[in-house]
Amino acid sequence: MAILLPDLPYAYDALEPYIDAETMTLHHDKHHATYVANANAALEKHPEIGENLEVLLADVEQIPADIRQSLINNGGGHLNHALFWELLSPEKTKVTAEVAAAINEAFGSFDDFKAAFTAAATTRFGSGWAWLVVDKEGKLEVTSTANQDTPISQGLKPILALDVWEHAYYLNYRNVRPNYIKAFFEVINWNTVARLYAEALTK
């Protein structure tokens, strides 16, 4: 078996006008596909470690040194993007009561959470991701990572992710990342967030 590129759960143009079809096509078919190909190439060198990227990236020191950085970059890139696609929706969804309560407890209000997440996404220098994660105590926190690093490697469980690499927004938003972040909040799939939150509390 090999890691497979997942299909998008909607059409390439389904998120317009917030995320354009050309960006989605390039992002999924080229960028994500490259991470998958490179992760598979690395894993082929060490079949003995298996292909469970979540397990491997939860403890990167167990990854053989000669493929460690490749799996951090490309395995992380695959996991991050596979999650990202699930967290976007053409249909409007609402924050569930459970997630809203957790957000209010952690941040004070939804607006305060949105401000914290926006700040994390805006101030992430260069390429990376902004995250809403569940920590080891089951509490929510906002964080960001560089490049394709995943919060899984820090013992955190991601439930919301925003790709702030320029390839995710530059065709439509040019250098104005804040406008892309604002648009992201229009297409979040809060049903997926709720599912991931429930799973994070039980696993």
Curated annotation (Swiss-Prot):
A Gene Ontology cellular-component term: cytoplasm
Keywords: Iron, Manganese, Metal-binding, Oxidoreductase
InterPro entries attached to this UniProt entry: Mn/Fe_SOD, Mn/Fe_SOD_BS, Mn/Fe_SOD_C, Mn/Fe_SOD_N, Mn/Fe_SOD_N_sf, SOD_C_sf
Molecular function terms from GO: metal ion binding; superoxide dismutase activity
EC annotation from Swiss-Prot or TrEMBL: 1.15.1.1
Co-factor binding comment: Binds 1 Mn(2+) or Fe(3+) ion per subunit.
Reactions catalysed, as given in the entry: 2 superoxide + 2 H(+) = H2O2 + O2
PROSITE patterns registered for this protein in UniProt: SOD_MN
One Pfam family, short name: Sod_Fe_N
Binding site residues for Fe(3+): H27, H81, D163, H167
Keyword Cell inner membrane: no
Highest taxon of the lineage: Bacteria
Cofactor(s) the protein needs: Mn(2+); Fe(3+)
Entry binding sites for Mn(2+): H27, H81, D163, H167
Role played: Destroys superoxide anion radicals which are normally produced within the cells and which are toxic to biological systems. Catalyzes the dismutation of superoxide anion radicals into O2 and H2O2 by successive reduction and oxidation of the transition metal ion at the active site.
Family the entry assigns: Belongs to the iron/manganese superoxide dismutase family.
Descriptive protein name: Superoxide dismutase [Mn/Fe]
